[in-house]
């Protein structure tokens, strides 16, 4: 389930500043930080860490993204001729056992366009999810950050468990396609039982196929990977741009390594103090607000969906209910149901330049044409949204992206909550009040970790000494 982005720069600034101040209390001791970092232990561990920190990266021209990264073509050169370079970083499978097994993380970078005197260092991006491939995403979004490249090397990576970084797989030929499962059951019977069964069977498939890595794909371990990357890149500080889930990853990094935090932007801040249910509720409100902004814009543009934002929101709620009962057939044998409608809308809300396409798609649905929104959802997918899993991914196809599987694995590793149907049903009124459009889906997404085979725990995000979060990167 996707995570809402900030609506405006002003909101981002105030939210980020509040986050910084809220993370400074109750700081852990140096001994506790060393335990969390995995830097204590035996002489063997110390030597292993030294070897990891002094490794060299073998940068080469990037190939096309692998199927697990979402596929596609090799990234084209930037307008000034700069070629994208890719490498792998060797890191411990388990940071609490740094002398044990290692895994490789996929990296990508574009060198700065500035002079050596202008260069500040590397700027590391995480575009959210969790589950999104940074290696596949960064080239497509690079035009948005070209000004930053005058001062930084632009760098991203596939976090552990994602894409080409020991990507989690939950393949099982016996699993139904997720599109066949009603994600917002309202019958309290067969539909609800089918959703519960799907989540539990998916969890079992994840253990069967990726059980060795499942305990180690959480955000705390990923943050430790980022500090290793900082050192191997030769930077004294980590300069960081995190979007959506990437803000949580940045907050955990700041908790573990406050002395190495450089310039940082957290865009669309996720509140790290909320449990999974409260976070989902906040997301529902965020999506509702974003859709109301779209609806206001649409009305001002004279779209045929309604005379004002209230009319457009009401019409869309009605469309979702109608499509839930009677999906629209689309060319190629597909269909647009209520869940698919919400997926398409939520994906298009991440950027205002997607709004015209969303307007056209919704107007087409009112004329019984679901093809436009189906195509929009497919076009946005992971890379267009900046971090939201694409529910159209076929998790039984080994040639498909693993973004959904990674989303599930990282989410469940980062939470001790294992919600039940009763938990969801008791909170549904709150979600419906927050958003009749997005609330039900986000409420039922709380069942994602039901039956998960390994225990989880929320990452610590106290971040003593984090300082100012949002700064001018140029």
Regions from the PLM with identified roles:
Residues 133, 223-224, 242-254:
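Glycine-rich nucleophile elbow surrounding the catalytic serine of serine-hydrolase chemistry
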Residues 233-245:
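Alpha/beta-hydrolase fold nucleophile elbow
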């Amino acid at each position: 389930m996707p995570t809402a982005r900030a609506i405006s720069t002003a909101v981002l600034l105030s939210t980020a500043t509040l986050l910084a101040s809220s993370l400074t209390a109750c700081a852990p001791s140096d001994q506790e930080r060393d335990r969390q970092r995995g830097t204590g232990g035996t002489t063997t561990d110390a030597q292993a860490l030294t070897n990891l920190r002094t490794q060299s990266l073998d940068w080469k021209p990037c190939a096309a993204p692998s199927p697990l990264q979402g596929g596609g073509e090799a990234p084209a050169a930037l307008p000034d001729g700069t070629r994208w370079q890719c490498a792998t970083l060797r890191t411990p499978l388990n940071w609490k056992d740094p002398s044990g097994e290692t895994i490789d993380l996929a990296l990508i970078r574009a060198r700065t366009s500035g002079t050596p005197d202008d260069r500040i260092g590397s700027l590391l991006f995480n575009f959210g999810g969790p589950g999104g491939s940074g290696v596949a995403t960064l080239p497509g979004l690079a035009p948005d950050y070209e000004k930053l490249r005058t001062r930084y090397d632009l760098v991203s990576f596939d976090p552990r468990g994602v894409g080409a970084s020991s990507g989690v797989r939950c393949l099982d030929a016996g699993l139904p396609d997720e599109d066949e499962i009603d994600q917002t059951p309202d019958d309290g019977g067969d539909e609800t039982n089918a959703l519960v069964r799907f989540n539990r069977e998916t969890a079992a498939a994840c253990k069967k196929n990726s059980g060795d890595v499942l305990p180690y794909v959480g955000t705390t371990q990923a943050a430790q990977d980022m500090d290793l990357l900082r050192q191997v890149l030769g930077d004294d500080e980590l300069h960081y741009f995190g979007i959506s889930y990437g803000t949580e990853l940045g907050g955990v990094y700041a908790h573990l390594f406050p002395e190495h935090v450089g310039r940082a932007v957290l865009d669309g801040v996720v509140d790290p103090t909320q449990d999974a249910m409260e976070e989902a509720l906040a997301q529902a409100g965020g999506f509702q607000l974003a859709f109301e902004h779209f609806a206001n814009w649409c009305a001002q543009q004279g779209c045929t969906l309604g005379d004002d934002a209230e009319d457009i929101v009401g019409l869309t709620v009605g469309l979702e209910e109608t499509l839930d009962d009677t999906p629209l057939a689309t060319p190629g044998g597909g269909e647009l149901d209520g869940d698919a409608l919400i997926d398409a809308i939520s994906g298009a809300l991440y950027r205002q330049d997607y709004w015209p396409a969303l307007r056209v798609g919704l107007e087409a649905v009112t004329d019984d044409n679901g093809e436009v929104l189906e195509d929009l959802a497919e076009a946005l997918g992971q890379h267009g949204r900046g971090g939201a899993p694409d529910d159209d991914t076929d998790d039984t196809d080994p040639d498909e992206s693993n973004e959904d599987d990674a989303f599930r694995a990282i989410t469940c590793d980062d939470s001790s909550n294992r919600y039940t149907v009763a938990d969801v049903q008791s909170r549904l009124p709150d979600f419906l009040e927050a958003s009749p459009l997005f609330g039900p889906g986000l409420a039922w997404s709380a069942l994602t970790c039901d039956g998960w085979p390994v225990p989880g725990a929320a990452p610590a995000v106290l971040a003593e000494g984090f300082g100012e979060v949002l700064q001018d990167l140029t």
